[in-house]
Swiss-Prot record:
<keyword id="KW-0547">Nucleotide-binding</keyword>
<feature type="binding site">
    <location>
        <position position="141"/>
    </location>
    <ligand>
        <name>NAD(+)</name>
    </ligand>
</feature>
<dbReference type="GO" id="GO:0008652">
    <property type="term" value="P:amino acid biosynthetic process"/>
</dbReference>
<keyword id="KW-0170">Cobalt</keyword>
<feature type="binding site">
    <location>
        <position position="246"/>
    </location>
    <ligand>
        <name>Zn(2+)</name>
    </ligand>
</feature>
<keyword id="KW-0862">Zinc</keyword>
<dbReference type="GO" id="GO:0003856">
    <property type="term" value="F:3-dehydroquinate synthase activity"/>
</dbReference>
<feature type="binding site">
    <location>
        <position position="183"/>
    </location>
    <ligand>
        <name>Zn(2+)</name>
    </ligand>
</feature>
<keyword id="KW-0520">NAD</keyword>
<feature type="binding site">
    <location>
        <position position="150"/>
    </location>
    <ligand>
        <name>NAD(+)</name>
    </ligand>
</feature>
<dbReference type="Pfam" id="PF24621">
    <property type="entry name" value="DHQS_C"/>
</dbReference>
<dbReference type="Pfam" id="PF01761">
    <property type="entry name" value="DHQ_synthase"/>
</dbReference>
<protein>
    <recommendedName>
        <fullName>3-dehydroquinate synthase</fullName>
        <ecNumber>4.2.3.4</ecNumber>
    </recommendedName>
</protein>
<feature type="binding site">
    <location>
        <position position="263"/>
    </location>
    <ligand>
        <name>Zn(2+)</name>
    </ligand>
</feature>
<dbReference type="InterPro" id="IPR030960">
    <property type="entry name" value="DHQS/DOIS_N"/>
</dbReference>
<dbReference type="GO" id="GO:0046872">
    <property type="term" value="F:metal ion binding"/>
</dbReference>
<dbReference type="GO" id="GO:0009423">
    <property type="term" value="P:chorismate biosynthetic process"/>
</dbReference>
Length: 362
């Protein structure tokens, strides 16, 4: 088992990474008599709910669960209310612990419930998708979507522990593994050129779910994110760099309707758009852009805009992005491979040109 610590100003919490951790009582910071509400979805429940429940019952915990519908389209206030109702019906107080057992959607909704219920209760993340393990479970971002924008209603609320059992990746569809690799590639592109090069050498084994390389990869991503979050917990500086490709990607998700493309698929195209824009600004070479495009393609990720979306469709969505200040776009771009920065007041015409370069030719 590996352990990465997230060091915050006022406290720290561990990320445990290893095989078989769902059944390891030592990973759960709970004691006999503690009340627990597990939040999960039907897909994950059939694989892992009884395993986690049995582990907690052995510790003497009082365990209940709520099962939410599966998919990004259910990351809503309605789902949040289902959690609140279950907590209230079970007479859960401020001393309860909410456990998110699932992917990014479950983690985000359960985390926001933990932040909101009785003004805050303890929260444990057990991410079961690659994307959640390397990204959304770490750092305390919680949210639900609105019809007009992704993650528009939420809070920064840190878990007390993150438990990453790599065995859960064995039950994932290939498409979910590939979507998670988009966020993995992002870390190398923004902050770690040696890691990007390592990915170029090992991407095929990651697609094939080699357990040793996956554990190495997850630990590296968690360490990069932990370091960034330690410097900037509430995204007032460096943490924004973690959003490479996300402004473009969120536009895709919002325009198509949540759930049509996976988050990682949209981010993959968004990263390439950001790279093309960076090349047009004179930061990257065409070879740099080609390296990123090739790596995304080897991870079986899309590299062109959805064929139902026109370049002009992007900007209205992008202008609702949370990084927009005074009505002006702020985009995460690349100064070089392995070094990102936040660009302010980028010419919208140049942004549109970069989007066109990544648009499918019919």
């Amino acid at each position: 088992m590996l352990c990465v610590n997230v060091e915050l100003k006022e406290r720290r919490y561990p990320i445990y990474i290893g095989s078989g951790l769902l059944s390891d009582e030592k990973c759960y910071p709970l004691k006999s008599g503690d009340k627990v509400m597990i939040v999960t979805n039907p897909t994950i429940a059939q694989y892992y709910l009884s395993q986690v429940t049995d582990t907690l019952v052995k510790k003497g915990c009082l365990v209940e669960h709520v099962v939410l519908s599966d998919g990004e389209q259910y990351k809503t206030l309605d789902s949040l209310n289902l959690i609140f109702t279950a907590l209230l019906q079970g007479n859960h107080g401020r001393d309860t612990t909410i456990i998110a057992l699932g992917g990014g959607v479950i983690g985000d909704v359960a985390g926001y419930a933990a932040a909101s219920y009785q003004r805050g209760v303890r929260f444990i993340q057990i991410p079961t998708t690659l994307l959640a393990q390397v990204d959304s479970s770490v750092g305390g971002k919680t949210a639900v979507n609105h019809a007009l924008g992704k993650n528009m209603i939420g809070a920064f609320y840190q878990p007390c522990t993150v438990i990453i059992d790599t065995l859960t990746l064995n039950s994932l569809p290939k498409r979910e593994i590939n979507a998670g690799l988009a966020e993995v590639i992002k870390y190398g592109a923004i902050l770690d050129l040696p890691f990007f090069t390592w990915l170029e050498q090992n991407i095929d084994s990651l697609v094939a779910r080699d357990p040793d390389n996956l554990q190495t990869c997850i630990a590296r991503c968690c360490q990069i994110k932990a370091d960034v979050v330690a410097r900037d917990e509430t995204e007032k500086g460096d943490r924004a760099l973690l959003n490479l490709g996300h402004t473009f990607g969120h536009a895709i998700e919002t325009h198509l309707g949540y759930g049509h493309w996976l988050h990682g698929e949209a981010v993959a195209v968004g990263m390439l758009m950001a790279a093309v824009l960076s090349e047009k600004l004179g930061n990257l070479t065409k070879t740099d852009v080609a390296r990123l495009e090739r790596l995304l393609a080897r991870a079986n990720l899309p590299t062109v805009s959805p064929d139902t979306m026109q370049p002009e469709d992007y900007l209205p969505h992008m202008l609702r992005d949370k990084k927009v200040l005074a009505g002006k776009l702020r985009l995460v771009l690349l100064a070089s491979l392995g070094q990102a920065y936040v660009a302010t007041d980028t010419d919208p015409a140049l942004v549109l040109d970069a989007i066109r370069c990544c648009t499918q030719v019919n």
